[in-house]
Amino acid sequence: MSRTLPHLLSPDPASPFPPAERALREPDGLLAIGGDLHPQRLLNAYAHGIFPWFSDGQPLLWWSPNPRTVFRTDAIHLSSRFRRQLRTCTWTLRADTAFAQVIAACASSPRPGQDGTWITDQMQEAYLDLHRRGYAHSVEVFDGARLVGGIYGVAIGQMFFGESMFSGASGGSKIALAALAAKLHGLGWPLIDAQVENAHLMRLGAQRLPREQFLQHVATQVALPEPPGSWTQRYGERHASGLAGVRLT
């Protein structure tokens, strides 16, 4: 008999999640309800292929959809026209220098078909805490001193779990994603989790993985040694124009 109700989480942030395979089929991927956004619970969730997604006024909802949307770090789609534009682009790229601004911009960016944002104040505080602990990271795109794009997510071991991205100017989010993918590919990290598909992600080269395959990949990657910490020095400052010649597809 299939389950029709999600698992109710214990108040203890150290309590385990149920196996992701027990997630509901309708709504797709809903696994658990309740709990909190304590860093221990969040990191445990991501390490098992689970993420929080809820709106203001809703209880905390935890998901593991099937299939899972991912990006291969060597397969971000940049059109020939976009690459030509990149060659003369004067924007610069940095990491972990404006995390709070990136997550705030993602929260305030309108999304087609969405009324309001799921990046609530509660969510922002939780990910700022993970950032201070060295687990949540951002890649930022600057036009001079102005932030024009960015992406943020969570890194555990050698697996990056993307959360959201934004464009403050045309192409800003695409450049942030491509820059993140190029850096991770160079480090040998093969995938970026993109959670749930939408048309924009698919145009950028996102792919669908069966949940079982995704969970196997996550288990392998999060177990690889990679200490938490700031990415600012590790990433350095780069020029967006350098992405024009990076082979990602």
From Swiss-Prot:
Belongs to the L/F-transferase family. Functions in the N-end rule pathway of protein degradation where it conjugates Leu, Phe and, less efficiently, Met from aminoacyl-tRNAs to the N-termini of proteins containing an N-terminal arginine or lysine. GO terms for cellular component: cytoplasm. InterPro entries: Acyl_CoA_acyltransferase, Leu/Phe-tRNA_Trfase, Leu/Phe-tRNA_Trfase_C, Leu/Phe-tRNA_Trfase_N. It catalyses: N-terminal L-lysyl-[protein] + L-leucyl-tRNA(Leu) = N-terminal L-leucyl-L-lysyl-[protein] + tRNA(Leu) + H(+); N-terminal L-arginyl-[protein] + L-leucyl-tRNA(Leu) = N-terminal L-leucyl-L-arginyl-[protein] + tRNA(Leu) + H(+); L-phenylalanyl-tRNA(Phe) + an N-terminal L-alpha-aminoacyl-[protein] = an N-terminal L-phenylalanyl-L-alpha-aminoacyl-[protein] + tRNA(Phe). Its EC number is 2.3.2.6. It is an enzyme of class 2 (transferase). This is Leucyl/phenylalanyl-tRNA--protein transferase. One of its GO terms (molecular function) is leucyl-tRNA--protein transferase activity. It holds the Pfam family Leu_Phe_trans. The keyword Metal-binding does not apply. It is found in: Cytoplasm. It comes from the Bacteria. Residues 1-21 are annotated as: Disordered. The lineage of its organism: Bacteria, Pseudomonadati, Pseudomonadota, Gammaproteobacteria, Lysobacterales. NCBIfam families: aat. GO terms for biological process: protein catabolic process. Keywords: Acyltransferase, Cytoplasm, Transferase. Disulfide bonds: none annotated.
